[in-house]
Amino acid sequence: MKKNLKKNRLLENYYKLPKGQRIQLKKYLCILAVAFLLFLLFLNLLHSCGWEGTDTPEMSETSPQHIPVVQKLKNVWITDAEADRITIFCDGEKETFFLEAETEGSDSVPAPEQMREQLADVELTDELVSAVVLKTDKFTGRVLSANENGIEIEGRGRIPLAEDYKGYRLYRELTMCTFADLTFGYANADFVWEDGVICGILLAREANMEDIRVLIKASDYADILHTEVILTADSDFLLQYGSGENIQEELFPKGDKITIDMDSDYFVGERISIVPAVLTGRIQLLSVNRSQGTPSYRGHIELLRTAEGIAVVNELPLEEYLFSVVPSEMPSSYPLEALKAQAICARTYAYGHMLRAGYPRYGAHVDDSTSYQVYNNITEADSTTTAVKETYGQMIFTDEGTVADTYYYSTSCGVGTTASIWKTAEAQMLDYLKSSRLRPSPENPVQTDDGAVATGSTEITAETIAEELSEEESFRDFITQTHAEDYEAQEGWYRWIYTVKEIDVDRILETLKNRYEANGKLILTLKDGDYSSQSIKNFSKVTDITIVKRGPGGVADELVIATDKGTYKIISEYNIRAVLCDGVTRVVRQDGSEVSMPSLLPSAFFVIEPSHDKKNMIGYNIIGGGFGHGVGMSQNGAKNMALQGLGAEQILNFFYEGCEICSGQ
């Protein structure tokens, strides 16, 4: 009651004040309130910075302590790894994280080659990788049933799923998956387990995917057979030997090295098979050397003993084969659309040879060299693998519905040629491989820096290019100039010079004999006014060399070499490139770089200028352009088309006229 009376008196006194004083009093009270709030805010700020008052001066002098933010990513898929970073795929997204400096050389983060394409727990400290725990304990088996409680595997029973398990579909486009995506009755997945539960599902392959069989050549591609094979694997692996019903198996732990020679006790039957215990396991051929070093192979390896040596055959899914073909055939730094065009070409080419095996004796469709497609010479790359996955199953078909012959080569000189250069009956039917000008507007007249190139009064157009450049004078005008509008005008191989100061007669003689043994119909001798196929006689002098016929686009098609003992006609671009290469002279490219050519000239798009001393030829100068045979897709042409905005389908439609791109599944 007294409090209320006191309050009422204060209010009465307040209202007795003049209006101006009341307003002034309100202002003072507001200022005091704001000052009090600022004081409280200041105290709170000091407290948050760790200041506890003047009684503890040592704390006020200490720098604020950083509390690290630690994040643990469970069961993520590592797609790529480098010395300073890793790229992971988790919850449908790819993300790259850099490594903490302290992890370098420590055991907390494995080496990059150990982390690539592995399941792992990744620890991040302030968004930097501080630890990686790989989960490499995997198995595979036929799936009989699956639900949220676990997965039933043939021979293993039901295995529980971890609460935080993750599933990844590795084929086609990399995506997430669950137990519901498993195919019952098939063993097309690996399972990663930890502490008795499944923590990862790796859908490695699509069921019933067709396989390709690749003959692996010896080191440096010196031979198709091996005298000894040394191998190991990055997972446990089976060695199967015997034949028929007497197949026996031995299980080896990952990292164990096995040596097989011609006298090995394992050769009870004809073949020995080495099969990784998991689908994502890889076999290393320690006795084989490639540009990448020691190659490792997906799929499984078979060893076949023959009288001459051991044939090594790698069987694996076609799509996985392409993972190692595309980076070996085209630099992984090229634009994605060019890589996709290369992937479609490579897939079509490989499938064509799966229909007609190149090595029926060894049970192989192709080998791993330039004789077919270079395979596993360069390590797989994320960009090229992406190109393969984004074009999954796509191939090129002719207008008749057959698989196209998708030949390709490195670089054009500004024009391509046709398959007629190979002098086979089949080549005559490949009418979709045309001789075309490689520039943005091929339908327009060919332009040089000084105007249109012409023979007489006829301009060279896309329609007349094959015929016009077959004429010596026209081709000479073309190849001795550069054409700024050409797609590859800035490429090193677009123009080159090869100057032989002293002719190597013995080398020419030896090469002529070798090429005659390979195909006598293409190395002819002049006798009684006609050329015919007969053995090459020795000669000691060369008196002249002349190109007597050019093919579509101006490619050298027939070459005549006159000697002191006879005159010879060399037919086909390959034979001509071989005969004129002395193995010593270096090619000088248009950018000034020099390149050794041990066995072949870069291309047969060239003109030759002999130098004579009285009656004999002492040397020759070659002005040429391009690298490769010139048939089908130019890879550097595709690169520059992609840089100018063309897509993979547009690129392929340019090089394979009238063909269609569709799924081969």
Regions from the language model: what does each represent?
Residues K2-Q665:
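Conserved, single-site charged/polar hotspot
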